[in-house]
Amino acid sequence: LLLNVKGKERYFPCRNLSMTDHQCFIIDPEDYVKADNTGEIVGVVHSHPITPPEPSQADKISCEDSKLPWYIVNPKTERWAYLEPCGYKAPLLGRQWVWGITDCWSLVRDWYKQEKNIELRDWQRPTTPEEFLKDPMFERCAWRTGFRELRPEESLKNGDLLFMSILNPGLNHVALFFDGDVIHHLTDRLSCREPYSEWLLKCTGKRLRYAS
């Protein structure tokens, strides 16, 4: 982090808790608090060890969330890039998958914000997708986000949620229903719209509708 301490800029190194290789970073909350107690946080500094310093889609999204300027460096080439909040919004379709930043729940939140101007609550994910698969949390979180389960006789409407089991036990994936298709973001794929096929129908365990 970059701090303003008594009028002088100071670099404050923080631990990275992310378990994913070079895909994203998670600043240790304890280090963040220490930095905040040391001075005013005025910027975020991080590296792209194996890629150019140009901001990734995840960088742009996280920069907006942080409301701070970002400084990105490739330590091998010593090239820098600068990024600041500018109102960037990731496209709903074709976005890259990054756990906790642009994943299936992120897509649902962004769709509801863009299409219905509804701000759905975000939920703190486990550090890794593997931890999440051991105890999928979105099903129990949905009830506290304003959704109710559809009755068997109710037909799907645009914007309804489909909780699915994809390749692993438990309802570990969420998709949006839209005009007979689904809009969703599977792990390590680009977000897309595709037909609500027989396979996806078999994967579906619960259907929910926003009720708040």
Model-predicted regions and their roles:
Residues 83-95:
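Active-site-adjacent structural segments surrounding the nucleophilic cysteine of cysteine proteases
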Residues 194-212:
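Glycine- and charge-enriched low-complexity intrinsically disordered segments
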Residues 44, 70-72, 182, 207:
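Conserved beta-strand scaffold positions in the cores of enzyme catalytic domains, especially
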Residues 1-41, 49-86:
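Conserved beta-strand-loop surface patch within small alpha/beta domains used
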Residues 92-100, 150:
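Short helix-to-loop capping/linker segments positioned immediately adjacent to catalytic or ligand/cofactor-binding
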Residues 117-129:
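Short acidic alpha-helical/loop segments enriched in Asp/Glu that coordinate divalent cations
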Residues 126-192, 196-197:
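...with weaker cross-activation on analogous glycine-rich loops/strands in unrelated enzymes
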Residues 97-115:
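Active-site nucleophilic cysteine motif
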